Amino acid sequence: MSTGSLSDVEDFQEVEMLECDGIKLDPNKEFGISNDSNEESSTCDNGSPKKGRGTSGKRRKAPSKKSPLGNINQEGKQVQRNAANARERARMRVLSKAFSRLKTTLPWVPPDTKLSKLDTLRLASSYIAHLRQILANDKYENGYIHPVNLTWPFMVAGKPENDLKEVVSTSRLCGPTAS
């Protein structure tokens, strides 16, 4: 499939070199290789005989020609690589800042402690579980059910249906829909 880019010219040159080196690419297949015996005995466009594989089974490399299109293509690839590297550095910087902010919000961790990202996530998860437990213990305080204790569709988590009717009728829900 042709994209019209400079790499198409380079790909075409590589195909010509491979054909002259005893390997014929099948145009119907993306990366298929056909080795017909009659193709090996024919000649290249420049009149030199195609080089087949010898008894050693090794293929000789044709000397590569430096072309101005190849240099432009290499520069384009380098620009793309540099841009991708810059995006990845920026992404990693944002991720590192997020982990450092998460680390500073954990109450049990001294500020000078070095934690891995995995340890930070584990501590944050256990801290969230601890906070949920505190909320679960205090969920009926002042007659309110905290929204974190509600599950879809706004039922108190972990209560049988009979108990839910009693809790909902005697408790008020937090938020704009509270009655």
Curated annotation (Swiss-Prot):
Span list, region Disordered: 23-87
Biased composition annotated in UniProt, kind: Basic residues: 50-64
Domain bHLH: 79-131
Regions of compositional bias (Polar residues) in chain numbering: 34-46, 70-80
GO cellular component terms, semicolon-separated: nucleus
UniProt GO BP: branching involved in ureteric bud morphogenesis; branchiomeric skeletal muscle development; bronchiole development; diaphragm development; embryonic digestive tract morphogenesis; epithelial cell differentiation; gland development; glomerulus development
Keyword hit for Transcription regulation: yes
SMART domains: HLH
Primary location recorded for the protein, binned into one broad class: nucleus
Pfam families: HLH (PF00010)
Entry keyword set: Differentiation, DNA-binding, Nucleus, Transcription, Transcription regulation
Compartments reported by the entry: Nucleus
GO molecular function, one term: DNA-binding transcription repressor activity, RNA polymerase II-specific
Organism superkingdom: Eukaryota
Free-text function comment from the UniProt entry: Involved in epithelial-mesenchymal interactions in kidney and lung morphogenesis that include epithelial differentiation and branching morphogenesis.
Quaternary state and interactors: Efficient DNA binding requires dimerization with another bHLH protein.
The protein, known as: Transcription factor 21
Natural source organism: Xenopus tropicalis
